[in-house]
Regions:
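FAD-binding core of FAD-dependent oxidoreductases
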Residues: 1-8
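A short helix-breaking turn/cap at a secondary-structure junction
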Residues: 9-100, 151, 159-170
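Glycine-rich, small-residue loops and helix-cap segments
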Residues: 12, 102, 107-118, 127-129, ...
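Conserved short-loop catalytic and cofactor-binding motifs
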Residues: 32-35, 128, 132
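Short acidic loop-to-helix transition motifs that present clustered carboxylates
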Residues: 65-66, 123-126
């Protein structure tokens, strides 16, 4: 979502398993999501509805029915609870971003959503990135360990492990 925001387009991270990961080269399997970038929210609804659903080639894909994202795009949000992470929103330093964020929150309130500020204790907030890094790096290492050219592929001879990998990868 950040790359999309930096480029003035829409990015969407769907619920894990909503879109099949079949054919995707994994980074960290338990964290990987398939999403898209589009020019606007309407296009994102169309793309997500087309991609979502059960795929027998991906055992982690969801069996749940696919919502009609496009039809539901203008649905009433009255009474829906939306949490704003105060720990995160307080850290916004760019005034334009801060003002846009406040505008979105106020729009949700005007449309009848129940907006609640939620705080995550600082010690937990500080643990999020290191925890993600440990999980992602461990899974990435495991997922990509077979790509060293030693166990799988066209292994070439060498006098050391480094030389075998270099020779196998540059053949």
């Amino acid at each position: 979502r950040k790359p999309a925001g930096f480029c003035g387009i829409v990015g969407f991270k769907p619920t894990w398993g909503r879109i099949s990961r079949f054919g995707v080269i994994p980074y960290a399997s338990s964290l990987d999501h398939v999403g898209a970038f589009t020019r606007n929210v309407r296009d994102m609804a169309i793309v997500t509805e087309a991609l979502a659903g059960r795929d027998d080639r991906d055992m982690t894909s969801s069996n749940r029915p696919v919502p009609h994202y496009l039809k539901d795009l203008n649905s009433d949000i009255k009474g829906i609870k939306i949490a704003v992470l105060k720990t995160v929103s307080d850290e916004i330093r760019n005034e334009d971003i801060k003002n846009n964020f406040a505008h979105v929150v106020n729009t949700f309130k005007q449309l009848g959503a129940i907006v609640e500020e939620v705080e995550i204790p600082n010690h937990l907030a500080r643990a999020i990135l290191p925890t993600y890094t440990i999980i992602a790096d461990s899974e990435a290492t495991s997922n990509h360990s077979c790509l060293d050219g030693i166990k799988y592929g066209d292994r070439q001879p060498g006098n050391s492990t480094d030389e075998v990998m270099i020779n196998s990868r540059t053949d």
